[in-house]
């Protein structure tokens, strides 16, 4: 019941966002998007900590390198200094491309979480669904933003996800689940950073305060 109530509240928030955002300024839209991306990154960090609490001893050794994340092919700024040199149109394009690239992986994680061999799989499953909700909400908000910014900001890079199976044994499932979550956490941090830079520019804050 609590889950349904929470989902209803978020759904109403999304509806309010879609209906009202067309009538408000770009800086306010940036602020709302930044708040949602911050929540997205916070949730992914919490999930990673949950997974760390019950991780196989050899997990760190066996887990694929970050360069194996399916979004690694997308060229993005490596730090804030580089991000500050990137145009608004490119930053919003990168954020939307990363967000879209996680639709299918989040579906996979959502389907695997309830039976994950982890004592907190119920909480993990609930948080994954929250990630999906916030990702959808943020994506809807960014769509409205680019409509205000113009055609040059609407380009999205297509990033295919070829994974569809976490493995058959318990260790493989835990490691691959954790790997995907670590990739998402990395990308959610990028999305959050890009949107915060955009927010700073929209509100004409000094770059060093972004």
Swiss-Prot record:
Family stated for the protein in its record: Belongs to the somatotropin/prolactin family.
Location of this chain's protein in the cell: Secreted
GO molecular function, one term: prolactin receptor binding
GO cellular component, as recorded: extracellular space
One example of a Gene Ontology biological process annotation: positive regulation of receptor signaling pathway via JAK-STAT
Name of protein: Prolactin
Organism for this UniProt entry: Salmo salar (Atlantic salmon)
SUPFAM superfamilies found in the cross-reference section: 4-helical cytokines (SSF47266)
Family annotation (Gene3D superfamilies): 1.20.1250.10
UniProt entry keywords in alphabetical sequence: Disulfide bond, Hormone, Secreted, Signal
Coiled coil: none
Matching InterPro entries: 4_helix_cytokine-like_core (IPR009079), Somatotropin/Prolactin (IPR001400), Somatotropin_CS (IPR018116)
Native organism taxonomy: Eukaryota, Metazoa, Chordata, Craniata, Vertebrata
Gene from which this protein is expressed: prl
Record's keyword annotation contains Disulfide bond: yes
Cysteine-cysteine disulfides: 69-183, 200-210
Signal peptide: 1-23
């Amino acid at each position: 019941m609590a889950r349904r109530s929470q989902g209803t509240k978020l759904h109403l928030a999304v509806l309010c966002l879609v209906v009202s955002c067309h009538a408000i300024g770009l800086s306010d839209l940036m602020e709302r998007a930044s708040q949602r991306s911050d929540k997205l990154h916070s949730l992914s960090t919490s999930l990673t900590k949950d997974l760390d609490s019950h991780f196989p001893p050899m997990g760190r050794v066996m887990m694929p390198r970050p360069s194996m994340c399916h979004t690694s092919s997308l060229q993005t700024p490596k730090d804030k200094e580089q991000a500050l040199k990137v145009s608004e149109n490119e930053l919003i394009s990168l954020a939307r491309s990363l967000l879209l690239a996680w639709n299918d992986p989040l579906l996979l994680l959502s389907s695997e979480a309830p039976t994950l061999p982890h004592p907190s799989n119920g909480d993990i499953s609930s948080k994954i669904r929250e990630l999906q909700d916030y990702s959808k909400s943020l994506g809807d908000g960014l769509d409205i933003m680019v409509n205000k910014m113009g055609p040059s900001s609407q380009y999205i890079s297509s990033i295919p996800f070829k994974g569809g199976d976490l493995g058959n044994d318990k260790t493989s499932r835990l490691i691959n689940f954790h790997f995907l979550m670590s990739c998402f956490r990395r990308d959610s941090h990028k999305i959050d950073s890009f949107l915060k830079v955009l927010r700073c520019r929209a509100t004409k804050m000094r770059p060093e305060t972004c």
